Amino acid sequence: MTIHVKNNIHWVGQRDWEVRDFHGTEYKTLQGSSYNSYLIREEKTVLIDTVDHKFSREFVQNLMAEVDLNTIDYIVINHAEEDHAGALSELMARIPNTPIYCTYNAIDSITGHHHHPEWNFHTVKTGDTLDIGNGKQLIFIETPMLHWPDSMMTYMTEDAVLFSNDAFGQHYCDEHLFNDEVDQTELFEQCQRYFANILTPFSRLVTAKIHEVLGFNLPLSMVATSHGVVWRDDPAQIIHLYLKWADSYQEDRITLFYDTMSNNTRMMADAIAQGINDVDPGVAVKIYNVARHDKNEILTQVFRSKGVLVGSSTMNNVMMPKVAAMLEEITGLRFQNKKASAFGSYGWNGGAVDRVQTRLMDAGFETTLALKTKWRPDGSALEVCREHGREIARQWALHPLDNTPARRVISPVKPAATAPQVTTAAQPMSASAESACGCNEVAAPQSATQPTVQSESGCMQCSVCQWIYDPALGEPMQDVTPGTMWSDVPDSFLCPECGLGKDVFNPIR
């Protein structure tokens, strides 16, 4: 089956209505997905990407019904992951000498998956072109770490089509191919879910790469993604949304998620949410039990939120395992511009709340006072929870509220060994109670748009792969001698792990 895209471009991909798990079981594809491959027939015939490996035979058979495989002049692989290049082995078995155009890093990935180093690879870099006849060219644009080191985009001149790889896509399956033909609510929900769960850690790179592409001043008629729809109706809309989402995005909403053994922590969550609504009925509040709800939906809601409250019962003096797993996911996604607080019930030891609070601080959230309740909360304890929610609403308000006291915060700059908390025996989050814990007000973490400053130790951390530059060690492989401060490191310096430049490094605080 083929679908006409534009002029001499046809979609030759594969729909996958049944898939419900992606990247192992890390991403729930509730709307299915598609693996988009494109066939270009100008004076030269070009295939851009293939499909997931489980559809290899069907893909090649469908392609053979459309074109003589021996007439394919070039294969372009924008991304070597198996859902993009999975059918290469099946295809190359029939046309083994066909040139494959890809990035240098893609060769390592492709040979690692398919074990054919003898294939006819041609490496490309940003700005390289490939003439395909009829006055048209393909222009290649490297996009490392969006979201693999090998990633790139391909732009077709004259037709003004950007084959964007994973960027601007979504795991969304529909009989229709174009964005103006599908349910708009479903589409944009899946776009945001995709960005929040996959691309958020690379937000700085998203912004930089989009501005780089826009700087080429190329006309744009379509964005042809690797998953989901082709953007033909106002294709720039998804680009502008990406710029918005990548810029420390938040809405006026608060997300609570928890796990509980005896419903006590659930009761706390409900009461806290009631308190938030008492003070600020305009704020959107969502509550999720991590053991019962879709993990990716929760992460998407956290991405959208200005703040998150994380609750856990104490089990063996630690947090519930599903809460711990969710916090690990959140740490990896590196959300920006968000506040957080921990809460939970306990019996003889409340270690879970302390650990949750510390993990939130480690993840870069601006944390406020935590809340513990012993055993099942009674009427007075639930009122403490409601008051806690009221104070959260005041402190996290994005607009003026009546009777809003000034609040102090705990910064993620220097996480404490034991997180401060209030209990049902204490005054809930009063100014005097918080002062008594010895916390001082400090500035919030720098946003990505602020100038980089050097940490007191001089150590800098790559925001993409987490590699750390230590001035005491330098980087001898790049002739950076021990004792070289970051400000004196040459601008040509590249992260040894991911190969990106100095602009993705942040000070370790």
Curated annotation (Swiss-Prot):
| CDD domains in the cross-refs | flavodiiron_proteins_MBL-fold, rubredoxin
Cofactor note text: Binds 3 Fe cations per monomer. Binds 1 FMN per monomer.
Q: What is its main location?
A: cytoplasm
Pathway connected to this protein: Nitrogen metabolism; nitric oxide reduction
Binding locations of Fe cation 3: 462, 465, 495, 498
User: Where is the Flavodoxin-like domain positioned along the sequence?
Assistant: 254-393
Please list the residues that bind Fe cation 2. 83, 166, 227
Region feature Zinc metallo-hydrolase, mapped onto this chain: 30-210
Domain Rubredoxin-like: start-end pairs: 457-508
For this UniProt entry, which segments traverse the membrane? Answer: none
PROSITE patterns per the record?
FLAVODOXIN_LIKE, RUBREDOXIN_LIKE
Q: Where does FMN bind?
A: 260-264, 342-369
Instruction: List, in alphabetical order, the Gene Ontology terms for molecular function in this entry.
Output: electron transfer activity; FMN binding; iron ion binding; nitric oxide reductase activity
Q: Which UniProt keywords apply?
A: Cytoplasm, Electron transport, Flavoprotein, FMN, Iron, Metal-binding, Oxidoreductase, Transport
What cofactor does this one take?
Fe cation; FMN
Binding residues for Fe cation 1, per the UniProt record?
A: 79, 81, 147, 166
| Compartment annotation | Cytoplasm
A cellular-component GO term for this protein:
cytoplasm
**Complex formation:** Homotetramer.
User: Which HAMAP family does this entry report, sorted A to Z?
Assistant: NorV
Reported function = Anaerobic nitric oxide reductase; uses NADH to detoxify nitric oxide (NO), protecting several 4Fe-4S NO-sensitive enzymes. Has at least 2 reductase partners, only one of which (NorW, flavorubredoxin reductase) has been identified. NO probably binds to the di-iron center; electrons enter from the NorW at rubredoxin and are transferred sequentially to the FMN center and the di-iron center. Also able to function as an aerobic oxygen reductase.
UniProt lists the family membership as follows: In the N-terminal section; belongs to the zinc metallo-hydrolase group 3 family.
Q: What is this protein called?
A: Anaerobic nitric oxide reductase flavorubredoxin
